[in-house]
Regions:
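Residues forming the flavin
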Residues: 1-214
């Protein structure tokens, strides 16, 4: 029998070789939008005070407070993502020469930090003219549908370079980021490989940093 129904290709996380194989074998594919941004970290007690409207925080019985943020800036969504109350920032790279971070909370949400992704919606047309971060790969030059993938890879590599070619994460105080200033010191962090001060506003694309700053 001939199967004529749909086929779902469940590639999982960071299966970039699969998409390159599909493009090389002339399987029709198209780019989709992604979300790119930073991870914010705060003292858990500060978020408790704000969310519970109590300068004494959450007390003995309330859980570590969460928050959610959603807005539109210049026609693109800007929103919090994967908020981790009483949690940690952890390395999440899936390949060499990458720095990627994620967040997690233990079951007791007992860390003295809380963190959240803060991301900007990115559409393929946003990056087509970004020569700084779109890799000039002649082998893939005939596959514009891979442009978003290359953009993501190069941004992860830039993070690795800015981190000193280690898993140290480039970081900036939030107030300095919005004012476009280098942070001369950084607060203590839950991210165990450590942080290094870096002007994120300078080397990340303006269509990301500008919307995040607003």
């Amino acid at each position: 029998k001939t199967f004529l129904g749909p086929v779902i290709l469940a590639t999982g996380h960071s299966a970039r070789d699969v998409y390159r194989w599909l493009a090389a074998n002339k399987v029709p594919i198209e780019a989709k939008g992604i979300a790119v941004g930073v991870r914010l970290e705060h003292p858990a007690g500060l978020i408790d005070q704000i969310q519970y409207h109590n300068r004494n925080g959450r007390g003995k019985y309330l859980p570590a407070a969460e928050y959610s943020f959603v807005t539109q800036v210049e026609g693109r969504g800007v929103y919090s993502f994967c908020m981790c109350p009483g949690g940690f920032i952890v390395p999440a790279a899936s390949g060499p020469e990458q720095v990627v971070v994620n967040g997690m909370s233990p079951s007791n949400r007992g860390s003295r930090w809380s963190n959240s992704g803060m991301v900007v919606e990115i559409q393929p047309e946003d990056i087509m003219n970004d020569e700084r971060l779109t890799m000039n790969d002649e082998a893939e030059g005939s596959h514009p549908e891979l442009a978003v993938l290359r953009f993501q890879e190069e941004l992860e590599r830039q993070c690795w370079l800015q981190g000193g070619r280690r898993q140290t994460a480039p970081a900036q105080r939030m107030a300095d980021f919005t004012r476009r200033k280098l942070s001369y010191d950084l607060p203590e962090s839950s991210y165990s490989p450590g942080l290094i001060s870096s002007p994120l506003h300078f080397w990340m694309p303006e269509f990301i940093t500008g919307r995040l700053s607003q």
